[in-house]
Design a protein with these regions (language model features):
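Acidic, proline/glycine-enriched N-terminal capping motif
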Residues: 2-144
């Protein structure tokens, strides 16, 4: 008699109550991890630029939530965050260095814990006139 295969256990994952909602908004380019902290005694603290970015990003996110009618879902819903970077010049930048501050400042507004966030950098290009970060945010279903 063949042994029954054990079911593969998944991470904690709730099915979204609002699976078809999508939130789109633009933000200024985030401060990179390299410019996020400064030394303060025995520790470190956020730079003024990082604190200002958090305020701006949270304000813009709140506006988008209100204007687009975004509804918060269950705690253990996973979210996809597609990111489109438009840099102001051709200087070499690591777009991945911008994720830490961005995800930390959106935590509590769009999702409960950035553990449940799947950030995906989709595109990086040049836009001298309007440098920005465009975000498309939506829940991931169990079958995706």
């Amino acid at each position: 008699m063949a042994k029954k295969k054990p079911e593969v256990e998944d991470l904690k994952r709730d099915e979204p109550k609002y699976p078809n909602q999508v939130l789109t908004f633009s933000l200024p380019l985030p401060v990179s991890v390299n410019h996020m902290y400064q030394s303060a005694g025995r520790g470190r603290r956020l730079t003024t630029a990082a604190r200002n970015y958090i305020k701006t990003a949270q304000d813009e996110c709140k506006k988008a939530i209100r204007s687009q009618g975004w509804k918060r879902d269950k705690e253990s819903v996973w979210y996809v965050m597609d990111l489109y970077f438009y840099f102001p010049d051709q200087r070499r930048r690591d777009s991945h260095n911008c994720l830490k501050l961005l995800t930390d400042c959106l935590e509590g507004l769009l999702f409960t814990d950035d553990y449940y966030l799947l950030p995906r950098i989709q595109y990086v290009t040049l836009d001298r006139d309007n440098p920005r970060l465009e975000i498309v945010f939506y829940p991931q279903g169990k079958e995706e």
